[in-house]
């Protein structure tokens, strides 16, 4: 089985970004959504990105942001990739000169394969748990058996993952990558070093 990548999302402090990098995480996520307790300012985002060692991908998370707002952030922060976690259409995700992927929320009634196919130019698709009124970071799992096999895009699995269930998740879903935020926190926006290290180690242990 190919190595599964890991992303630690909702990073708000330089020290937490360095913890993730030291643990071997492949990517970190910065939330540019003001309603989130994990939102970061432009200044803090710049500090975090500047502190990272090479080969750690920086992902900016947006929720129904305007094109102007996204461009302003990209002018200020050297992000590698964009994650669209709202109700963005394919056209709204394109044109930023960065690779991007779309988050889709799974609640049980969707045609996941058809939704994935709509985002033809995405680098991948992230599947998260549907909770009404909450775009992400719910801390709840969805039924992984709802994921169709052989999706047309690399799959990033999110939603309620922890060090205790990630090995089972990988074995069942066989995703390209896993994405975690609340499952490695001491409190909202503050990461727990032991939880981060344990999570990444267990992701890497799955063969």
Curated annotation (Swiss-Prot):
It catalyses: N-(5-phospho-beta-D-ribosyl)anthranilate = 1-(2-carboxyphenylamino)-1-deoxy-D-ribulose 5-phosphate. Keywords: Amino-acid biosynthesis, Aromatic amino acid biosynthesis, Isomerase, Tryptophan biosynthesis. NCBIfam families: PRK01222.1-4, PRK01222.1-6. Belongs to the TrpF family. This is N-(5'-phosphoribosyl)anthranilate isomerase. Its EC number is 5.3.1.24. It comes from Stutzerimonas stutzeri (strain A1501). The lineage of its organism: Bacteria, Pseudomonadati, Pseudomonadota, Gammaproteobacteria, Pseudomonadales. GO terms for molecular function: phosphoribosylanthranilate isomerase activity. It holds the Pfam family PRAI. Gene3D superfamilies: Aldolase class I. The gene is trpF.
């Amino acid at each position: 089985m190919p190595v599964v990548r890991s992303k630690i999302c909702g990073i708000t402090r330089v020290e937490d970004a360095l913890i993730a990098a030291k643990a071997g995480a492949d990517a970190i996520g910065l939330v540019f959504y003001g309603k989130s307790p994990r939102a970061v300012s432009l200044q803090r985002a710049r500090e975090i990105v500047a502190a990272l060692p090479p080969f750690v991908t920086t992902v900016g998370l947006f929720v129904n942001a305007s094109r102007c707002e996204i461009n302003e952030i990209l002018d200020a922060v050297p992000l590698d990739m964009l994650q669209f976690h709202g109700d963005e259409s394919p056209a709204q995700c394109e044109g930023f000169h960065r690779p991007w992927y779309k988050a889709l929320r799974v609640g049980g009634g969707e045609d996941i394969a058809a939704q994935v196919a709509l985002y033809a130019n995405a680098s991948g698709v992230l599947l998260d748990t549907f909770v009404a009124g909450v775009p992400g970071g719910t801390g709840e799992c969805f039924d992984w058996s709802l994921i169709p096999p052989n999706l047309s895009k690399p799959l990033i699995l999110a939603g309620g993952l922890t060090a205790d269930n990630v090995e089972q998740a990988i074995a069942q879903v066989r995703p390209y990558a896993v994405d975690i935020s609340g499952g490695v926190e001491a409190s909202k926006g503050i990461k727990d070093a032991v939880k981060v290290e344990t999570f990444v180690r267990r992701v890497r242990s799955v063969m």
